[in-house]
Each structure stands twice: as structure tokens, then as C-alpha cells.
Amino acid sequence: MREAHPIERAVGMAYYASDSDGTGGRLRDSPADFRVRELEAFDTQPADAPTGDYPWLVVRATLHEWDTNDFARELANTVGMSRERVRWAGTKDRHAVTTQLFAVRDLDAAQVPEIRNADIEVVGRAGRGLEFGDLAGNAFEIVVRDPDAPERAAAVADELAAFGGGTVGTPNYFGQQRFGSKRPVTHEVGLAILRDDWEAAAMAYLGAPTEHEPADSQRAREYVAETRDWTGALAEFPQRLRYERTMLHELADGGSFRDAVETFPSNLQQLFVHAAQSYVFNRIVSERMARGLPFGEPVAGDVVWFADSDADAAVAQPDAARQQRVTDSRVDVMARHCERGRAFVTAPLVGTDTEFADGDPGEITRGVLDDLGLSRADFDLPGEFDSAGSRRAILLRPDLTVSHDPLAFEFALPSGSYATVVLREFLKPSPLAL
């Protein structure tokens, strides 16, 4: 089994599913080389629907090199409202051309602004704002420039088909972006919050410099880690590090470490604990690989969720209302359901209400939590940090097409899954190149 890059191992992604060398090559030579389009699953009314019943205006934005949070802030600032009144279903990467929905509360269609590098069209109105996961999935069109050995893609695909039980499959890891591409610390903040160590949470975000960020950022983080001089640190931190500067202002004004962490927008506060859950999930998936347990079919003790019958097969998601704990007598039956795409083997996104699997799968989860010094009760947290938990499929089966000249990948993934998790298998690059 091929070990992953150390940066990936630091976020729980310990292995590749394929042993073959990758194609190499470069991603995102230009934003147009990495296109992402939401597969929408959100009901709207006509744009002239009464605003009393439908206070949210829904727009579709095609963004060129915009981070989702930054665009939402720019949209809110341009129309003179709080960023908290802008909602979306999924966060997209800056270095791409992305098309996604945004919902804006109490905005008229005539007030939609023009924003640089963004094409915005009105879709309609809705009675509620978008929430995270309010989409069927995402469609990707990705071009790889100057691959070293594009012919290797075929061997990788064959190995992934063996891993996936006949069709190309990869571990459904949370990708590097979940934790921070160049500075993966969001899970460290989340783990500190779970341990009720707000000082460690704040300092994980403010300090902890990495060699992969600009030199002025590194110096600022080193300064604040060494001195705890909040006012002095404001003179060191570049203006572009907005969240850090807001935290420093709070600390300089006498606020607590928890107060500083709670200066983040509510969606980012949730992201910290979600990143910790994601790290635990990745560790569980990696340990399952290390033990040689299958991904495309269950073993006794697994918790299997049936597929959402309303979803397109390419982006089908597990349905929480239809699940089964696999006994020895049901392994073969459930394996057939999984093989046909009717069900998924799952692992937990641990929270207060998580029920552990039995047998080896349950032992793996308990072992990971014990190693991290965590329990389900630790997820019973105040405000935006609380999480009841859920489950997630451990196998990702992209509907994949590979073409050459140029080397390109086209596929669709369900909501919450990562294109880079597929691409890392084919390219075998440094995570920083993804």
C-alpha cells in the first residue's frame, strides 16, 4: 500500500488506493483549467414572488478566482448589508471558474450589483436561505498541463477499479482544502475547542507558521507565538490576514481567547469543529485501509446506509433514514446492494449522537478517538460549535471520463466530496500542487 505525502498524513490521509506512479503535471495553469459547476437541488419561486413570504433572493454566480467567503463579503458590502445575510450551499476554491447559487436576504432583483470577475444572474426567490449541502453535487472539468507520463492514467484507473469493486473508486477522504491547503490548521483549532482549550484554539490560528506561506505572514505568526503582544502583533500582521487581525483586536481590547475565536463568522466557527470531525473520519478511513478491510462491500459490524432514491446515480448520497447494521448473516445481501450502488458502507462523523459500529469497524473508531483523547461527549459544545454527528460513505465512485491531448478529467461528485481526492490518485503530486 502506497503511503501518502507527509502533508496529507498530517490531516489523516495516510494512503493511496493505487500503487502505480502518477501522470505528474500541473493543475490550474489558468482558472479555466479547473471548472466547477454546482448540480443544483434548491427550489425557488419566480423573482417577482412576494417578498414577505419569500424574503431570500437567489442568484447564480459564475466566479473567476473568487474564494466563496470573500465573494459573499464583497456582495454584502456592495449592497450595504451584513455578510451574515448571504448564504450558499458549498464552498469553492479560489483558483478556478466556479458556478454556484447564493441566497441574499431582503434584496430586490433590481439591486443585484456588478462585481468584478463575476457574472451574476437572478434565479428567483425562496422562503429560506441556502444551507450547507443544499445541492446534489458538483460537476468538474479539469485540465492537466504538461504531464510527465499521461499514459499512466490507464494503470491508475485499473487499480482504482479494483479498489472500487469494478468501477473506479477512491477513499472518500476529506481533501486538503478542508483543513487549509497551504496551512492546514482548521482541524487543530477544532480539536482544541473539543478539548475546551480556547487558548490553544486561538494560538493554532494566530501562530503556527508554515514555510508554505509568505515570509511576512511567517514573521507575524512567529512574533505573536513568542510574545503574546496583541497590540504589537497588529503592527506585524499584514492587512490581508483579516481574521487574524480581528482576533488580535479582540484580545488587545481585553477579550478572552474564546471571545477571539468567536469573532469568526458563524459558518467558519462551525467549520473548525467540522474540520476536527473530518480529521477523525480520515483517520478512521486510513486505519480501515491499513487493516485491509474492503470499501466497496461491508464486513460484519458495519453500518450501511441505503442510497437516496431521489438522487441521480452519479451523485447519490446515503439516506440517514434508511440504514442497517450488518450482521454475519446479512453480509452477502448487503454486499450485493453496495455493488449495485443501492447502499454505502459508512464511517462516522463523530458527534454527541454517534452510534458506533460493531466488530472491526467499531474498534477502529474507538481506537482513533482514544488516540486523540476524545469522546462523543466532547462534541456537546456551546453555540455554533455543537455537533450531533452523522455518517459518511467511505467509498467515492466518480462518474469519470479521462481524455488526452490535453490530459483532462471530467466527473461528477456528490455534495461534500473532493475532486482533489480523485486527482491525487492520478497525478501523485505534492498536495500543495492540488
From Swiss-Prot:
Enzyme Commission numbers on file:
5.4.99.27
Q: Which reaction does it catalyse?
A: uridine(13) in tRNA = pseudouridine(13) in tRNA
PROSITE patterns documented for this protein: TRUD, UPF0024
Where does this protein come from, organism-wise?
A: Halobacterium salinarum (strain ATCC 700922 / JCM 11081 / NRC-1) (Halobacterium halobium)
Q: Which InterPro entries match?
A: PsdUridine_synth_cat_dom_sf, PsdUridine_synth_TruD, PsdUridine_synth_TruD_CS, PsdUridine_synth_TruD_insert, TruD_catalytic
* Function summary: Could be responsible for synthesis of pseudouridine from uracil-13 in transfer RNAs.
Designated name of the protein: Probable tRNA pseudouridine synthase D
Q: Which GO terms describe its biological process?
A: pseudouridine synthesis; tRNA pseudouridine synthesis
Tell me which stretches of the chain form a coiled coil.
none
Q: Which UniProt keywords apply?
A: Isomerase, tRNA processing
Name the family the entry cites.
Belongs to the pseudouridine synthase TruD family.
Residues spanning the membrane:
none
Q: Which GO terms describe its molecular function?
A: pseudouridine synthase activity; RNA binding; tRNA pseudouridine(13) synthase activity
Q: Does the keyword Disulfide bond apply?
A: no
Q: What's one Pfam family here?
A: TruD
Pinpoint the TRUD domain residues: 169-396
Q: Which gene encodes it?
A: truD
- Enumerate the active-site residues: 93 (nucleophile)
